[in-house]
């Protein structure tokens, strides 16, 4: 499985201000650009993985957030592909040019990965927010070169992950990717390396999630899929 580090997130000291506004910030490209200009949302200059912990009922689970090729979502629910809401969501994501939250995937984690993420969690968290349901979401940035290399090596050895999210959301992401790819091909600029060919994913150990995995809050970790 190929999973790369990535940048894009709210300003650390303004996350509690940003999250309640995500409905407006992610309502359109102009609103998002305004939030970036205001310093509410950041585009990190460097690339990093993120350790993500969700704690509450029924327990605690830790995943790693990374960029994966969009084809990891291939084979999502065919019925969802015909869903009118999913098609509308795909168009909205393509117009916004940003993936609003990571898609949740389940993968075969290794004990070494547990050690790496455990070490990352010993430091101060980048974010720690509790939602109205009482679920606490914590995020740690992993950007030390040796840690990034170790995580990348572990993920390179892992089998392809399985979808552990709403099939309609996965379909919307693949649909947005296809719409933007079609536009690039029509313009004669398609290379295959564009950011819309990748998706930001929260990868959770399959042994810790049954069926649906936790969802990272909308706007907490996003992915710009095309130029504004």
Where are these regions (language model features)?
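Surface-exposed, charge/polar-rich loops and edge strands
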Residues: 1-161, 166-228
């Amino acid at each position: 499985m190929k999973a790369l580090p990535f940048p894009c997130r709210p300003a650390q000291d303004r996350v509690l201000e940003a999250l309640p506004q995500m409905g407006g910030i992610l309502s359109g490209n102009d609103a998002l650009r305004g939030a970036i200009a205001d310093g509410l949302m950041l585009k990190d200059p460097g690339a990093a993985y993120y350790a993500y912990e969700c704690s509450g009922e029924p327990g605690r689970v830790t995943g790693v957030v990374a960029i994966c090729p969009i084809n990891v979502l291939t084979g999502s629910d065919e019925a969802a592909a015909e869903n009118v809401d999913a098609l509308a969501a795909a168009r909205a994501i393509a117009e916004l040019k940003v993936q609003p939250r990571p898609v949740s995937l389940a993968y075969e984690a290794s004990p070494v990965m547990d050690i790496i993420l455990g070490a990352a969690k010993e430091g101060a968290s980048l974010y720690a927010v509790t939602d109205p349901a009482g679920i606490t979401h914590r995020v740690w940035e992993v950007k030390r070169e040796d840690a990034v290399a170790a995580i990348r090596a572990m993920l390179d050895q892992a089998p392809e992950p399985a979808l552990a999210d709403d099939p309609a959301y996965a379909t919307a992401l693949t649909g947005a990717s296809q719409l933007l790819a079609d536009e690039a091909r029509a313009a004669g600029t398609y290379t295959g390396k564009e950011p819309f060919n990748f998706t930001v994913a929260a990868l959770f150990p399959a042994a810790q999630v049954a069926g649906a995995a936790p969802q990272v809050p909308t706007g907490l970790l996003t992915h710009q899929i095309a130029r504004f």
